[in-house]
Design a protein with these regions (language model features):
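Membrane-proximal basic amphipathic "stem/tether" segments
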Residues: 1-38
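Active-site and donor-binding regions of nucleotide-sugar-utilizing enzymes
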Residues: 30-121
């Protein structure tokens, strides 16, 4: 019970901090974040969208959001890749800069458990 309360307080504090940071960090229209299958797999429509953008839209920077499990595969297939490990502090700050976010399941499952979506499309 105490562990659950601690986790809830931690998650709420993180969300509030990210919300406050979102007012100071400007979204960049050339940044695109893509996630799929909770970050566990580099598959599905998100994969093809990411590869298409990297190949055909050199003006955009693609960030793939995933777990450590998918990092190696993303490095091999997505060039130039920018991998963000889901729910890490550095990933959430980088996500605050992304103007566009694409996901296959739900935003809080594929991209981040924290609220990094204010003013994102």
């Amino acid at each position: 019970m105490l562990k659950e309360i601690t986790e809830t307080i931690k998650r709420l504090s993180g969300s509030i901090l990210l919300l406050l940071l979102s007012f100071a960090i400007r979204r960049r229209k050339e940044y695109v974040a893509i996630g799929s299958w909770g970050g566990e797999n580099y598959i599905d429509n998100g994969r093809y969208l990411a590869e298409y953008i990297c190949k055909n839209r050199k003006d955009l920077k693609v960030f793939w959001v995933g777990t450590k499990k998918t990092r190696d595969e993303v490095e091999k297939k997505l060039s130039p890749y920018r991998f963000l490990e889901k729910d890490t502090v550095s990933a959430n700050i980088a996500l605050l800069k992304c103007r566009y976010m694409f996901f296959s399941q739900m935003h809080n499952y594929d991209i981040s458990s924290y609220n990094v979506y204010r003013k994102a499309t």
